[in-house]
A protein has these predicted regions:
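Phosphate/diphosphate ligand-binding glycine-rich loop within oxidoreductases
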Residues: 2-108, 206-209
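Structural motif
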Residues: 11-16, 32-35, 54-58, 118-121, ...
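Glycine-rich adenosine-cofactor-binding loop
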Residues: 12-13, 93-96, 103-148
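Short beta-strand elements in bilobed, periplasmic/extracellular small-molecule ligand-binding domains
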Residues: 22-33, 137-139, 159-164
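Adenosine-phosphate binding glycine-rich loop
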Residues: 26-28, 200-253
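Conserved S-adenosyl-L-methionine
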Residues: 132-138, 157-159, 215-216
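Short, conserved SAM-binding/catalytic segment
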Residues: 150-160
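Rossmann-like adenosine-cofactor binding region
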Residues: 159-223
Length: 253
């Protein structure tokens, strides 16, 4: 019987040689061509690849050539695939669940928090995962008001929610009603952060703004390895301890 260790893992969009970094986990990983995507995925299925890790530059194109789950659809992208013979590859985006893992790890009390989510498009999908932790209220600031309204349609009916755009002049006033600011994409609008806020920064670029405003920064230091653990589980069915994936997460992004 063939074990999962004998079945190759595809690396889609990663440079040749990246697979060497996975050998210590007992995985055989092979970089495959980037396209045409549908032909590459059919070949992976025919060659009995168990799954694929998808590099960031190809993740948005996965939805058109796979069977995306609800997480991938909300995010507008997929970072990992699982292959099933005779069927389209099953695609998901692991960032939302990994974010919840990281928040639990940080100890930040999300339940009951009044959150302001700032971002655009699928990037806001990861932040919307916070609604599963019992937010007290949510203000959703997307690239435009119609985009925010579209994203809000999937929110729990019981959640007190308000939608706006990130360019709304009233955003600073709306931020004063929040205690948690979540930035999922783009720059932080001027004047939003106050000393009483906690900032959850998914862009990794707003730490300086938090420091200048005197705001607390919710630590997400283990997010990369927590996310990689979920990606590997989806692609291979195997569970790996996040602590052993820290260096590898830096390679695979």
């Amino acid at each position: 019987m063939t074990s999962t260790h004998d079945t190759p893992l595809a690396l889609l969009g990663y440079p040749q040689g990246t697979g060497r970094a996975l050998r210590d986990l007992g995985l055989t990983a092979v970089s495959v061509p980037e396209g045409p995507l549908l032909e590459v995925l059919h070949a992976c299925t025919a060659l009995a690849f168990q799954g694929a890790l998808v590099a960031a530059n190809l993740q948005a194109g996965m939805l058109a050539v796979t069977q995306p789950d609800s997480a991938a659809q909300r995010a507008g992208s997929a970072d990992v695939l699982a292959f099933v013979a005779g069927r389209a590859a099953h695609a998901t985006c692991t960032l939302p669940d990994a974010l919840l893992d990281a928040l639990e790890d940080s100890g930040y009390p999300v339940r009951g928090a009044r959150a302001l989510l700032i971002g655009q498009g699928g990037d806001l999908g990861a932040g919307l995962a916070l609604t599963r932790l019992g937010l007290g209220s949510l203000t959703l600031a997307a690239a435009s008001h119609p985009e925010a309204e579209a994203l809000a349609r999937g929110l729990p009916a019981s959640l007190k929610a308000h939608v706006t755009s990130r360019s709304d002049p009233a955003l600073v006033t709306l931020a004063e009603r929040a205690d948690l600011i979540v930035l999922t994409a783009g720059p932080l609008p001027p004047g939003v952060l106050q000393p009483f806020h906690a900032l959850l920064d998914l862009t990794g670029r707003a730490g300086g703004a938090a420091s200048r405003a005197g705001s607390a920064l919710v630590p997400l230091t283990r997010l990369p390895e927590l996310r990689l653990a979920r990606r590997l589980h989806h692609a291979t069915g195997q569970r790996f301890a996040p602590d052993v994936l820290k260096e590898l997460a830096g390679v695979l992004g």
